[in-house]
Amino acid sequence: GNMFGAVQFYTKAKDAGVQPIIGCEVYVAPKSRFDKSSARADDPEAGGNYHLILLAQNEKGYRNLCRLVTAGYKEGFYYKPRIDRDLLKELNEGLFCLSGCLASEVNQAIMRSDLAKAREVAGEFAQIFSGDRYYIEIQDNHLEEQITANRELVSLAKDLGLPMVATNDCHYLH
């Protein structure tokens, strides 16, 4: 839910001749960012949010990403900075969205064997991020849950005509 190293990363990548991609793993409240419920209905241990990846496509996207992260801290903070679908509908221009890791709403539905819910959620995000800006994300981290999820994610992407992207659950130390 933060972009603390974004400017330094951008500068160093440019200096090295690498095209940087600025993004953030955001936390999405299951309902409104103003709802301070302590847990998701589907997983009381999850801390009240789902993960989602947002990547800036251009300067407008970077500015919207900054606005989303700021709103997460100022308006949606409940243990972590959280945003919601209303903010995503308002501030999605210039952003790509990836469906997220195992803690995403799509993957959590798959883990509960609720494929209809996974399809519904993916469809909602595909509408918000129209024009092929929503990607189904698969990862190869050798976890059994991920292997199961990947199988369903590939099928889901094909069924809904959504593009896919292979990633890894990366985080930084410094």
Where are these regions (language model features)?
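Phosphodiester-processing cores and adjacent nucleic acid-binding clamps
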Residues: 1-174
